[in-house]
Every structure is written in structure tokens, then in C-alpha cells.
Amino acid sequence: MDYEALKEQWGEVEDRDGVRLSWNVFPSTRMEASRLVVPIGALYTPLKEKPDTPLLQFDPVSCKQPCRSVLNPYCQVDVRARLWICPFCLSRNPLPPHYKDITANAIPPELHPSNTTIEYRLSRPAPAPPIFLYVVDTCQEEDSLAALKESLIMSLSLLPEHALVGLITYGTMAQVHEIGYTECPKSYVFRGNKEYAAKQVQEMLGLVQPAMRPGMPMQQPGRPFPAGPASRFLLPVSQAEFQLTKAIEQLQKDPWPVAGNLRALRCTGVALSVAVGLLETSFQNAGGRIMLFAGGPATEGPGMVVGPELREPIRSHHDIDRDNIKYYKKALKFYDNLAKRTAHNGHTIDIFAGCLDQVGLLEMKGLCNSTGGHMILTDSFTSSMFKQSFVRIFEKDADDNLLMGFNAVLEVLTTKELKVTGLIGHAVSLNKKSTSVGETECGIGNTCTWKMCGIDPSSSYGIYFEIANQGGPSQNMQSPQKGMMQFLTYYQHSSGHFHLRVTTIARNLSGPAGDPAIAQSFDQEAAAVLMSRIAVFKAEVDDGPDVLRWVDRMLIRLCARFADYRKDDPSSFRLEKNFTLYPQFMFHLRRSQFLQVFNNSPDETAFYRHVLNHEDVSNSLIMIQPTLDSYTFDQEGGVPVLLDSTSIQPTHILLLDTFFHILIFHGETIAEWRKAGYQDQEGYENFAALLEQPKEDARDLITDRFPLPRFIVCDQGGSQARFLLSKLNPSTTHTSGAGAYGGVGAQSAQTIFTDDVSLQTFMEHLMKLAVSGTN
């Protein structure tokens, strides 16, 4: 099967099951697996929107304990004996009585070969409606606060009627608004410079009640939620909308005076720990989101990231490298503990930063990364980037249910040939051991079950596996054996019930050693994304240069293993079609903002890495290797061009998409004509149309992008052109003279002033090292 046909097949599997695998044939021995270099991994998007996924209105048929795998198309069914055989533990299970009428031609939907992904609406209802708790920073300029208030009031109309909603505001103090009290505005005030234990918060808010003691039966689910003490602070939208709108409208800038040489006092840490304490008491394991809107860094109390004096700058990457960090370790520990508590309770924390300065995302990143929350970094709450990204969180499906899932848990089962080594993505381990758990660890390992809390249709997780068998495949098998994995995602649907999405994947095991089927089954795009997740995971704990060396070493080893070459002859080096782009992806990953922190603040690095760990293969590839399209007079529409400095031409317009930025770049001549106003003159309609075309294409790119990218229009030689130049392969630098691609293009291409090596030089070194056999 040729590469294009295989790619199409993998695309169909991704559309159907939300899964891309690095290897689509599994090696049959551990020895063979170790020679693959790139681990066996799956990038899985559990809630991938798929209109034709059947929603079954009954509980699934499961295998007996401890296996608990779910009936799926790969199960053998004995219709006469009314039995099914589990492919994971090989035990025989009786079919339930209501399946008595099945025949070889009339099978239930979960056994249908095309239903490898299926969703069940479980009979278990959610313990409470979804909860939304807004935590709002009032130390902001008037215009920013006014824009934020407008967005918050508008968002109330996007929430389901029965959802519970509450408000905490903070500045020098933190205030919990009692929206259930209608006589006058009433709030409980917490000191901003004091650390409150969970118990203190609960006592001060009067939340301690006997009904919610551990071990007591939970109240029967249903509407409306019973009026416990927490209902003074969290009320259904239908009841609280008027009170809450009034409370938000009346929000004023924090009254605490701020001297000219000081930052405003902000107790972000106290506000968050009060929010966590409020939900923890009454709503443990009920789906809820704490949404933090931060207009600046925490400057007092637990979790402070910078002192109040303006002459003391907030930490940079350089400070962290030199260990010149006064507050970092303490703040990180505080927020990480808060993240653990929140994840344990099944709640999600979103952070919206609306500030030109850093707000402390580096310290707070665990709050989002452990709970599946969103992280959105903008310059101000007045920006369309914030407003539109915020609205997109509340997108709904055809039945008017929010597209977000709450309180989610992912379990992975494997057949005996495979073991799961870990997960990289926004989740925490539930420390559940099973026969599916491997000996080694990659990412969050030593478990087969993870808790994600917040999950949405684009949440994607990198799951890594190892091969368990020491010996080879059994020689007497007629048909190839299959290795299998099953993903079980339990989550609270916003309609009020728990759902279970089941995806079952089976792939052939390779034949005897040296089976060419393994190399042909390599999906270079999925592999690049799975490897970049490992690199970013390593970058969080290791030194930058060490991670780059690891990326290089793995690439050299992969090429040495799978390329065709004569030893010590770089000119003979050839890669198969499904490997040719992989070195290029690694070249751009090495230069990307995920691994190179130069020119980015620590907050930006935390934000970029957070988004990479949330997206699927195609979006992650855009982040690693941005797309570049060129527009000029003698062609129809945009044409994809090389991400290379030779693509900059005076009479061309370029459209760059890095996922985080969408940039329109006018070549020198085009910019001069535009400044001269030719597009407004008669007879130059084609020039006006040329200027419009990239804008229209950019609009299409923005429509379903989350978070909303920053939109930049710039000219060759302008200061904003740096966004493009930093992403291009520098094949024409001040040292290289004419371009490496040669020809006319290179003569008129822009020179890039950089000491970075070009892709061509990188490939030359790679070939030399791969064929030398010393790796």
C-alpha cells in the first residue's frame, strides 16, 4: 500500500476513533520494540466530535472483575451458547438476558464492525448541576474592568438555566459574595496576607454541616439542588441571574490606595484557596469550574509571585537559570498543592490573564494542567482575543448542551502483548495498578487510570506503551495476531448524566524479526507530536541543552535504523516517504518556543506548552512547523510555500499560521504600492483583490481556533516582521551569501541575521552522523 493511501486510511481512523498511532503495526518482541527508537504511542481525543457516534441509552456490557473491559466489535460471540469472549483477559462471559435474540445477522450496535468508538448514556445521574465560580481581580484599570464585567454578564446567558453560579472578587482582600441574600449586597471578607486552611474557610463561611460528612449517603440527584449552606453562595442561574448581574455591575476598582512606585496588592492565592474550599465542602466529585480572571500578578499572601515594589522586576528565564528567584519555589509549592486538592475534588480551574506584564502563569500552571482547565494569555480584557476565546468555552452542541465534560476519568486496557507506560497531557494519576501497567514510565506513569476533571472535544492525550513479550510471535498462527487497547472515558455530560465513551483499537503484531511491515506502518506526523510531548515533559524538569541533545540523539538513531545508506557514505542516504518529513519536524521543534525560551517570558512558555499538550496531531504540527502560503498576481489564491527565507519575495504577500499568531506579510514592492494607495485607484482592482485574499483566508483560519490567535499585519522591514523571520528556515543568512536553493529566488530573498543553522546544514550533519554507525 503506498504512503498516500496509508495516510488516508489513518485519517479515516482518526475521524472515526479520534486516535493516531506512531506505529500502526506493533513489534512482537521487546527487543524489536527497543530498536524502533520512537515509542509506541497513541494521541487520543476522547470527545472528538463525531455526529454518527451512536449514543446508547443503556449501561455497557462489561467483562468480569478485575478486567472490566467493555463489549466491542473485536469480541468473539458464541450465539448458540449466549457467551462472549473478552479479547483482553480471554475469559468467557454470559450475554445479558435482553441479548437473547441476537443472531449472526442481527447484532447489537456495540458489536458492529464500524462501531469501534461508541458512547453510552449511563443510568447514573450527576450528583449536582455543573458549577461555575467566577474569581475576579478588581485591581485593574477602569476600562479593563468594565470590559471584563460586560463579558461576565454576557456569559450568564450562555450557561444552562440549572447550572450553579457564584462570585468571588479579590484585590487586597478576597470577598465571597452571598448572592442568596437579597436585602443588600453582602460578602464575606478574607484577609489577603493570611493563609487559610480548608477547615477555616469552611467554618468562616458557615459551610460545616452534618449532611456532607464522609460516608453519609449523598442526596438523591435531581432538580432543584437542596438548599444546603453553600446555596447562599452558589445558586442556579435562573434564580441568581438578577442578583449576580447587579453584583457584577456594582464592582468597583479595588479601593486600597496604590502609591506610584508600587504594584497593587493582589491576594490571588487566598482568593483561589477560598474558591477551592467552598466547592470542596459541598460539591466533592460534582462537576465544577473555577474561572480566574487575573489582571496582574499576586503581590501578597500565599502564592505571591513578585513583591509590591515596582523596582523589583518579576522573574525572567534568566533569573530562574541563575536561581535568583525569591518567591518562585514557595509559590509553585502553594499552587501545586491547591491543584492536587482541586483535581482530587473533580473540579477544574481556568486562568484568563488580561495584562501586559506577567501574572504568574509559570507558578500557577499546575492549576490548569492538573485539572484540564483552559489557560488564556491576553494583553487586556478589552481585547477581542479574550472576549472571543471566553465565549468559545461555552459552545454548545445541537441539543443545546455545553460541549464541555466535567469530572472525567480515562482508563486504558491492553492485551497481554502491550503495557501502558504513561500519559502526557492535562491529567493526574489515579494510581490504579492493573495487568496493563508497564515496568517503565513515560510521562505520568505507574497507573492505567487518570483523572482529567475538565475535558472538551479537542482535549487530546499522548498515551505511551511498551511491548511485554520477551519471545517472538507464535509460529503456528495462521492469521497475524493482533495487539489491542481499549480507552474508557467516563465523564459528566452537561445534560446532567454520566456518559462513557469507549474506543477499541486493534493492530497487527509484526512477523519474525526484520518484518518490513513495521517501517511501512510509521506515521511520521503522529510520531513527531508524541515525541514533542515527551521533549516538553522533559524540558519541565531538565536543562534546555540536555533536551535538545536528547531530540537530536533520538533523530540520529531513528535515521540510522530506518534509512537506506552505505556505511560512511552520506551521499547514499535515503529515507522512505513516510520518514522524509520527520527530520524537518524535529528541526523546527528544536527552534520552537516550546524548547527555546529566548525572547519569551516564563508565563508565555508555560502558556505555549499548555496549549501544545491539549491539541490533536494537525493543530500540534502547525505549532511545531507553521504553515506558509504565498499570494501574487499570476496565481489563483494562496499557494503553500517552503517555510524558508527564500519564500520572501518583493511582489508576494505571505500568510503565516503558527496557531498562536496569524500573520500577513507584505513584500517590499507590495508594501510600497499599498502605501501609495494604488488599491483605491481605478484600474488596480486586481491589486485590491490581492490584498483582500489573505485576509479572507486568515478569517477562515480563525473561525474555530481556540484560543483565538493574535492577528498581525506587517511589511517587509517592519518591526513586526520578526514574528515571520524567527520561524523561517534561515537558508539565506549574512554568512551564506546566495541561498542554498540557489537560483533567482535566492538573489531577491531576504537575508536573515542569525547564527542558527539552516535545515540544509542540519540535514547534512544528520546524514553524516546516521551513516557513521557510531550512535
UniProtKB/Swiss-Prot annotation:
It is a peripheral membrane protein. The gene is sec23-1. Zn(2+) binds at residues 63, 67, 86, 89. It comes from Neurospora crassa (strain ATCC 24698 / 74-OR23-1A / CBS 708.71 / DSM 1257 / FGSC 987). Component of the coat protein complex II (COPII) which promotes the formation of transport vesicles from the endoplasmic reticulum (ER). The coat has two main functions, the physical deformation of the endoplasmic reticulum membrane into vesicles and the selection of cargo molecules. It is found in: Cytoplasm; Cytoplasmic vesicle, COPII-coated vesicle membrane; Endoplasmic reticulum membrane; Golgi apparatus membrane. Belongs to the SEC23/SEC24 family. SEC23 subfamily. SUPFAM superfamilies: beta-sandwich domain of Sec23/24 (SSF81995), C-terminal, gelsolin-like domain of Sec23/24 (SSF82754), Helical domain of Sec23/24 (SSF81811), vWA-like (SSF53300), Zn-finger domain of Sec23/24 (SSF82919). GO terms for molecular function: GTPase activator activity; zinc ion binding. The COPII coat is composed of at least 5 proteins: the sec23/24 complex, the sec13/31 complex, and the protein vtr-7/sar1. Coiled coil: none annotated. GO terms for biological process: COPII-coated vesicle cargo loading; intracellular protein transport. Keywords: Cytoplasm, Cytoplasmic vesicle, Endoplasmic reticulum, ER-Golgi transport, Golgi apparatus, Membrane, Metal-binding, Protein transport, Transport, Zinc. This is Protein transport protein sec23.
